[in-house]
Every structure is written in structure tokens, then in C-alpha cells.
């Protein structure tokens, strides 16, 4: 992550049609997560971005973005573009199409924190989509404390970024 963040440039504009093609039309088979912002899909290559060995995670908004939502998203993109912290993935690309706003990050092949903590059938399916034959072992207590410390450090950084 640190090497990616150090080499990060301002996020590139990525056309929506390119994201649609790369994710097979935002196919369920490419979905690796879902959260408050929307769904996350994996793709291996995007012509608008330099190739990265880990692939890409494309976060999509659950609904179309209105004028106010677009302004808020542009503000968030400016903040994320300026961020450089060892515990934050760099924002590589953006698509601010009113029909579907998307943020592009490097793909974390280790899975989400939620999936590493709660080994549900859905988590096992997502691990398989990331290339695992079986789920990785649960996080140790020491690893959980490191995650907690690193997340707190990243949140503090974001909230004090000016």
C-alpha cells in the first residue's frame, strides 16, 4: 500500500463505458463487496489507467448522483486525491457520470476486514472470487490490534487533513 500511495498521481478520469466493459456490465460474478456507498466490483485492466499487478476495485454508487450529490462527491474526490497515508489506498481513477459515479482503487486481494472477521458463506464466496481456494486463516489478536491502530491513524489523518 505504501509503495502505491507514494507513487500515486492525481486520479485519472475513467469513462463509464470503460468501467462497464471491464466489470462485464457490473456483473454479479465480479462483485466483491457492498457497503454504504454502493457495490464494489473487481476488474483486471482499465485502458485509462496504468496496469497494476493486483487489479482494480471499482466502487459504484447505489443510485444515480444528483447535482448536490455530484458536488459532494467532487469534494470527496479532492480530499481523497490529496490524502497520502500508509493505511489508505490511493484513489487511482474517478468517473463522475450522473448515471453512475465510480471510484477506482487498487484491489486488496486479501479480502475485506469484515470477511476476515466473520467467516460467513458469502465471505467464503468472495474469497473464491479473489482467487482463494479456501478462506485465509482468521486474524490473530495481534493482527486485529494492528488493524485497529492503523485504522485509527488513518481516520485521524483524514479528519485533520487541511
What kind of feature is each model-predicted range?
Residues 29-40:
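Protein kinase glycine-rich loop
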Residues 73-78:
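Regulatory alphaC helix of protein kinase catalytic domains
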Residues 90-101, 109-110:
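Short beta-strand micro-motifs within the conserved protein kinase catalytic domain, predominantly
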